[in-house]
Amino acid sequence: MKYTTLFIFIVLISIPGQIVQANKTPMDSASMEMAIALLHESDLSRGNVSGIEWDIDIESKSKGKTQRNSLRVLVKGTNALAIYQSPIKVKGRKLLMKDRNMWFIKPGLSKPVPISPRQKLLGGASNGDIASTNYAGDYTIKSFTKDQFNNEPCFLYDLKAKNKKVTYDRIRYWVSKKRKIGLKAEFFTLSGKMFKTAFFEYDHTIAVNGEERPFVSKMIILNAMVKTDKTIMAYHNIKIKKISPSSFNLNLLVR
């Protein structure tokens, strides 16, 4: 009997993708509630509020070539409308995300083009990166452990996408315990390979429910396979404001 048990154990740990957590115990309900609450707090500092507008300047450097785009983004919860401001050749084009569905809208086209949040926008930035972050709603917490980043105490989340409509399949995410903001993220492909890393800076502040809190000023994306490739998303002109639901009406946007 003991040899049968040993054989089964060896087979289990040999199966590709099988995760054996001999020293870990499942989170209790209180720990899970705390983990979700902290993740939600970190989402607020990356745009998941009831009404907000910002400008993004995206700069991508790859193989000695630099590309730039600028967009104005209107956000209401998980809905977002991004309007290209520059360069001139793309000005007026739009990206709409509504209920985690996404479309590309180009002046002169009679119909919007369905796109995926996972598709490349510019450099290391994906379409979904321009929208607000809703990790607390879009991902399942697979694990939640204490860690550090740059000597700052953090909680390290291992997040798994709830569906294929979200931007990434799996994320490892470091959230500051004290400041309640995301500091670093590692993004993984469907096959489980890490393909990019992001670091976040918070030089802006916004008022949410009467409370001042940090707001993202920069997202720096590094390609895990091509070390010299780098994309910077810089956030400017942050404004808390009322956003009309009609801003996300697909029929109105294609007129």
Language model feature labels by segment:
Residues 1-4:
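Positively charged n-region of N-terminal signal peptides that target proteins for export
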Residues 6-15:
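Bacterial N-terminal signal peptides
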Residues 50-81, 85-87, 180:
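N-terminal, post-signal-peptide region of Sec/Tat-exported proteins
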Residues 79-80, 102, 112, 182:
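Hydrophobic residues embedded in beta-strands of well-ordered beta-sheets
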